[in-house]
């Protein structure tokens, strides 16, 4: 089972949302969305909407007259997001593959993807597909993680899991941190006919977080739970080891940070 397949069969979005959302993902969502004008040059498409953290920020920021289309490959994630944001009018939901978007050419004025492109098998193809559905001059906003060494909470989890499953390629969880090179990002953007790329490093502090909450989010709240259970290892055992590693690195309550890159570009 590949990491991509695990993502598609993942069934624990509530752990992701409740344990990682408030301290890690929502602050980055706020930083990403504030870079979008309230009236971009057309409707807005979100790829890999997950549990809806970026979606909520987008709907609150955008002019109410603009259509917001939120998509994800995972029906489970979409169902969770819809349940969380059902009170928000003006959001359309659709299950969609980022490599085969079910929309016509030049259908949107902006496309937003928070921490999703790293998991797409062909990132260049995804960006070309993004360019296809954007109007000329349309806005692209992405967030990706910086190096895993700049994310000590993630490093702690990766080290524990890789030590528990040595030599197991599926259990090497560095993939989310492989797009940290600005030169690579600019190359991919240029190859998909995006211009005027701006890339900013952003650090979000963790203040007084519970190590076990972070560990629970990292294990039960991500597709790695599917891969661990497939190997017959109790999730609580792994969570306990990750929590201990986090406490060793950052104390209890845990103090540290998450670091990512915020990317802006225009469709050429």
Predicted regions and their residues:
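Class I SAM-dependent methyltransferase Rossmann-like catalytic core
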Residues: 10-23
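Conserved Class I S-adenosyl-L-methionine
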Residues: 5-6, 13, 51-53, 173, ...
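A short glycine-rich, Lys/Arg-flanked "PGG" loop and its adjoining helix->strand segment in the class I
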Residues: 124-139
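A short acidic, Gly/Pro-enriched loop at the edge of an enzyme's catalytic core
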Residues: 99-111
């Amino acid at each position: 089972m590949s990491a991509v397949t695990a993502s598609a069969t993942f069934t624990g979005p509530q752990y992701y949302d409740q344990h990682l959302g408030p301290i890690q993902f929502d602050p980055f969502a706020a930083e990403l969305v504030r870079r979008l004008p309230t009236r971009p040059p057309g409707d807005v498409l979100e790829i890999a909407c997950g549990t809806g953290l970026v979606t909520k920020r987008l709907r609150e920021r955008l002019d109410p007259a603009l259509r917001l289309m939120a998509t994800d490959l995972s029906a489970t994630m979409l169902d969770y997001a819809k349940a969380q944001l059902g009170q928000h009018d003006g959001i359309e939901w659709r299950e969609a593959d980022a490599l085969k978007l079910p929309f016509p050419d030049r259908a949107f004025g902006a496309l937003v993807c928070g921490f999703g492109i790293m998991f797409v098998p062909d990132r260049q193809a995804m960006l070309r597909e993004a360019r296809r559905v954007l109007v000329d001059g349309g806005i692209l906003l992405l967030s990706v993680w910086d190096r895993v060494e700049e994310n000590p909470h993630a490093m702690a989890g990766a080290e524990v899991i890789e030590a528990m499953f040595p030599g197991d390629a599926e259990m090497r969880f560095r993939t989310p941190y492989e797009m940290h090179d600005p030169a690579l990002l600019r190359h991919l953007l240029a190859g998909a006919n995006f211009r005027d790329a701006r890339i900013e490093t952003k650090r979000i502090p963790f203040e007084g977080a519970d190590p076990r909450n972070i560990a629970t989010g990292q294990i039960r709240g991500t597709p790695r739970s599917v891969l661990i259970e497939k190997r017959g290892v109790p999730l609580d055992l792994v969570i306990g080891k990750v929590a201990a590693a986090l406490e060793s690195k950052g104390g209890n309550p845990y103090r540290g940070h998450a670091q990512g890159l915020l990317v802006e570009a225009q469709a050429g």
